[in-house]
Amino acid sequence: MRIVSAGVVLPGVILAGLFAACAQERIEIFDAHLHYNQEPRPLYSLNEVRDIFRRNGITGIIATSRPNKGTHELMDAKWPELRVVPFIRPYRVRSDIQTWFNDQKIFELIKSEYARGYYRGIGEFHIYGKSAQSELVKRVVDFAVERNLFLHAHCDEEALLILFRHNPKVKIIWAHTGFSVSPARVAELFDEHSGALWGELSYRGGITGGDGKLTSDWRNLFARYSDRFLLGSDTWINERWFAYDTIFKEYRRWLAELPADQAQRIASGNALRLFGLRRQ
């Protein structure tokens, strides 16, 4: 097929690519890893945050903040164009990252926050290796399962498997999809934990190659498991807020290489399905 317009002849394959790219420019995105922590709040007011979301086509977020006040503010804003899915952050201050899993006061924090009545998950939390075997971590896992909450775990594979051993019914969003775990191993873990494990893609290495294009391994992984991935910004430091536009421009660039149905699921469809939300 060829299209002739203004004297220009475009082969059908080129035209299809242009249509796909335009579609991904318009696609809605759900940011499944958004922190509104203490540090950026003096620099980025709620109105400025809203403007950032609008210009990047963000229509939903997982909000997880340190302290949780940042998430409270995002919930209280009640912006009609944005679905906010709040997660409990088990941190009061940044140093809790290193100790939360043995601090009984953190469990009290989780219970106190949960009493607000709107939370859908716990995390993002950091846990590595055998630290996940602590009694407190098991209590958190069981608490989540009993209340149908997701966990958002920044962890290595060893800790991930321990979380599932604590309670096989747990539902985990794996922050960064293991950073550098091989695509083949990611596929194995998805198969082993069908309906219980999803991968969030911020900071994930290897998705694109030196030419900026999707690698064959990740193209194949997205083809097989497009229903298991989520996008995220991970605004853990102010620089990530500064780079927000660039982060999502890059996501849109490689989403445009995927079939439209795969791109739509990864961009927002999976998050909407997981949290029982409808498109606006």
Stretch-by-stretch model annotation:
Residues 40-41, 114-188:
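Divalent metal-binding pocket/active-site signature
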Residues 69-150, 198, 205-206:
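Active-site gating/metal-coordination segments in enzymes
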Residues 2-5, 10, 20-33, 41-65, ...:
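Mid-to-C-terminal alpha-helical segments outside catalytic/metal-binding sites
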Residues 35-37, 66-67, 89-93, 125-128, ...:
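Active-site beta-loop-alpha junctions enriched in small/polar residues
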Residues 175-280:
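H/E-rich (His + Asp/Glu) clusters that bind or coordinate divalent metals
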Residues 30-34, 61-63, 84-89, 122-123, ...:
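Hydrophobic faces of well-ordered beta-strands that scaffold small-molecule active sites
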Residues 34-45, 94-101, 209:
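Acidic/histidine-rich helix-loop elements
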Residues 45-48, 68-76, 104-110, 157-161, ...:
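Alpha-helical scaffolding within the catalytic cores
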